[in-house]
């Protein structure tokens, strides 16, 4: 409604941007791909265009904005203020989404893929029945972010007293996110209540993997501290590369291992002892390092990344087409962000 049917590519990017904040990009793409397909068919646009815009929107906030597991783990590891990390992440990810939309229109538009949607947009709306209103739909996402933001402001101002303590408690990430979960559960239609337990079980299963990765990343960081490689990395920190150091390290892990979350957590663990040496010990400096690692973890989504195959398979792309659309786009997004961060770091 806001952007209109003519700007449906922008709508897909914006939809991905919002959905990627609390949801893994892989899961978000699977859930939203029927809408992408239906919009592509309705607007007579190549499915590759819609898929690229959606993928980029999801990827930007997945890599940069807590409470997605990777960014929130980085913020905790590096001691970055969570509220400030969310605010900066939301702002920095906007240029990344714009890059994704431009890439979709200029590059992915050369890839012709028929949408062949099983449902029209109207049929999808009818299939899901009456859905919650706009405010209700956004509440489980926005309320935790607002609570975390208020807690950060209280901390910065050094406020004390009962009210300050209440907001500090409610703004703790675990508490704020739990409130969001309860809000979401409260909006489940009666006929779907029977599925609640299976959804919770699936969520616990997914989070267990993240906890294991976080723990392994921390342990790996401690191992690296005891190895000669740490001295090499510290030497790299004195080369004047500044904000590019965490970006480069994250790129190496991303390209070699494929998983953005693993690249983020591992790089954050390596960067901990280098923060003061590199001059990133200030609150904003720590957040910039989180953003730089997030940008590096974007470069680039290719064949060893599960997200690459999710996007290609659910968008009917051939492998070479996915390299052109997905890999090229994610590389452009990450490079754009690090250049922006470099300019900002000159004034911090």
Predicted segments, located by residue:
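Hydrophobic alpha-helical transmembrane segments of multi-pass integral membrane proteins
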Residues: 2-35, 211-217, 238-278, 294
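Re-entrant/interfacial helical elements at transmembrane boundaries that shape
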Residues: 1, 27-39, 68-78, 115, ...
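Transmembrane helical segments that form the transport core of multi-pass membrane transport proteins
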Residues: 147-257, 261
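Long, contiguous bundles of hydrophobic transmembrane helices that form the permeation core
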Residues: 87-199, 315
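Transmembrane alpha-helical segments of multi-pass membrane transport proteins and ion-pumping complexes
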Residues: 5, 9, 17, 21, ...
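Short amphipathic alpha-helical coupling elements at transmembrane boundaries
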Residues: 1-4, 34-42, 126, 198-206, ...
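Alpha-helical transmembrane segments of multi-pass membrane proteins
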Residues: 5-20, 43-63, 81-90, 94, ...
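Juxtamembrane and boundary regions of transmembrane helices in multi-pass small-molecule transporters
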Residues: 43-45, 80-129, 295-348
């Amino acid at each position: 409604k806001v952007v209109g049917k003519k700007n449906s590519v922008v709508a897909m990017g914006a939809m991905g941007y919002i959905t990627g904040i609390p949801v893994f990009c892989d899961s978000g793409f699977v859930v939203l791909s029927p809408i992408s397909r239906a919009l592509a068919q309705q607007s007579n646009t190549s499915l590759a265009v819609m898929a690229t815009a959606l993928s980029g929107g999801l990827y930007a906030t997945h890599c940069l904005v807590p409470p997605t597991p990777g960014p929130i783990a980085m913020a905790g590891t590096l001691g970055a203020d969570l509220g400030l990390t969310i605010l900066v992440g939301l702002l920095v990810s906007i240029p990344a989404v714009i890059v994704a939309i431009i890439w979709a229109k200029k590059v992915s538009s050369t890839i012709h893929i028929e949408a062949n949607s099983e449902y029209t947009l109207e049929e999808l709306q009818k299939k899901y029945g009456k859905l919650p209103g706009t405010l209700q739909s956004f509440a489980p996402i926005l309320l935790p972010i607002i609570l975390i933001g208020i807690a950060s402001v209280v901390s910065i101002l050094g406020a004390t007293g009962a009210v300050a303590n209440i907001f500090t408690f409610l703004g703790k990430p675990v508490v704020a996110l739990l409130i969001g979960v309860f809000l979401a559960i409260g909006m489940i239609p009666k006929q779907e209540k029977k599925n609640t337990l299976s959804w919770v079980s699936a969520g616990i299963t997914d989070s267990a993997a993240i906890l294991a990765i976080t723990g392994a990343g921390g342990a790996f960081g401690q191992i690296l501290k005891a190895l000669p490689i740490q001295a090499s990395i510290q030497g790299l920190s004195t080369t004047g590369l500044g904000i590019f150091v965490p970006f480069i390290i994250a790129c190496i892990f991303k390209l070699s291992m494929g998983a953005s979350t693993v690249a983020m957590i591992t790089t954050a663990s390596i960067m901990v002892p280098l923060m003061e040496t590199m001059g990133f010990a200030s609150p904003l400096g720590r957040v910039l390092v989180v953003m730089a690692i997030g940008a590096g973890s974007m470069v680039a989504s290719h064949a060893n990344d599960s997200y690459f195959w999710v996007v290609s398979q659910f968008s009917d792309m051939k492998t070479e087409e996915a390299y052109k659309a997905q890999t090229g786009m994610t590389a452009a997004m990450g490079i754009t962000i690090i250049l922006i961060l470099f300019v900002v770091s000159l004034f911090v």
